[in-house]
């Protein structure tokens, strides 16, 4: 069983039940899914950029990403409806816990000048979003094999009703929040 899932069952659930007064362990908030997205703006001029971003995302998450297409045309960006402009992966279950473990323990500590993630990036409904400026913080990505440095958006969707519950859940799982 994944390390974080075991930690959730053995440590997080009892701590959350005690702090928030849940009567039933099934009422304790849990992580539902993690969505990782890479926006590839240069795909308008260079269609090969999408494949490179998809390859990087597949290596990082262990799952084949879906190509996202533009919903409407925007003349200023030379963008037409239906053009590929990004790649996204939705992780659930074991892969989700494996990715979260990798993010917390391997990737975030490798970010330059890292002092913790912002505690203000919750959306008001218990979901947390963070952005990474480069994919090189993940140990699977080799510097010589990439064509250019790309950032990514990571959204952690929880079943928590409030931001306070979600923050406590992520903090107990080891997410390094700024003090």
From Swiss-Prot:
Protein family per UniProt: Belongs to the universal ribosomal protein uL5 family.
Query: What domain of life is recorded for the organism?
Result: Bacteria
Q: How does it assemble?
A: Part of the 50S ribosomal subunit; part of the 5S rRNA/L5/L18/L25 subcomplex. Contacts the 5S rRNA and the P site tRNA. Forms a bridge to the 30S subunit in the 70S ribosome.
Q: Entry's InterPro entries?
A: Ribosomal_uL5, Ribosomal_uL5_bac-type, Ribosomal_uL5_C, Ribosomal_uL5_dom_sf, Ribosomal_uL5_N
Q: What does this protein do?
A: This is one of the proteins that bind and probably mediate the attachment of the 5S RNA into the large ribosomal subunit, where it forms part of the central protuberance. In the 70S ribosome it contacts protein S13 of the 30S subunit (bridge B1b), connecting the 2 subunits; this bridge is implicated in subunit movement. Contacts the P site tRNA; the 5S rRNA and some of its associated proteins might help stabilize positioning of ribosome-bound tRNAs.
UniProt name for this protein: Large ribosomal subunit protein uL5
The GO terms this record gives for MF are: rRNA binding; structural constituent of ribosome; tRNA binding
What biological-process terms (Gene Ontology) are attached? Answer: translation
Organism, by scientific name, is Dictyoglomus thermophilum (strain ATCC 35947 / DSM 3960 / H-6-12)
Report the GO terms under cellular component. ribonucleoprotein complex; ribosome
Q: Name one Pfam family in it.
A: Ribosomal_L5
Alphabetized UniProt keyword annotations: Ribonucleoprotein, Ribosomal protein, RNA-binding, rRNA-binding, tRNA-binding
Instruction: Specify the taxonomic lineage.
Output: Bacteria, Pseudomonadati, Dictyoglomota, Dictyoglomia, Dictyoglomales
């Amino acid at each position: 069983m994944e390390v974080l899932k075991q930690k959730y069952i053995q440590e997080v659930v009892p701590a959350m039940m005690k702090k928030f007064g849940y009567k039933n362990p099934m009422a304790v908030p849990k992580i539902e899914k993690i969505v990782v997205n890479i926006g590839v703006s240069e795909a308008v001029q260079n269609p090969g950029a999408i494949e490179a971003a998809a390859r990087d995302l597949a290596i990082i998450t262990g799952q084949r990403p879906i190509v996202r297409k533009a919903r409407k045309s925007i003349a200023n960006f030379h963008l037409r409806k239906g053009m590929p402009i990004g790649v996204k992966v939705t992780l659930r279950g074991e892969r989700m816990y494996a990715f979260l473990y990798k993010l917390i323990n391997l990737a975030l500590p490798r970010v330059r000048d890292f002092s913790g993630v912002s505690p203000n990036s919750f959306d008001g409904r218990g979901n947390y979003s963070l952005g990474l400026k480069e994919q090189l913080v993940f140990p699977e990505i080799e510097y010589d094999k990439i064509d250019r440095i790309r950032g990514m958006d990571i959204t952690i969707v929880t079943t928590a009703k409030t931001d306070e519950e979600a923050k406590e859940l992520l903090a107990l799982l080891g997410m390094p929040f700024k003090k």
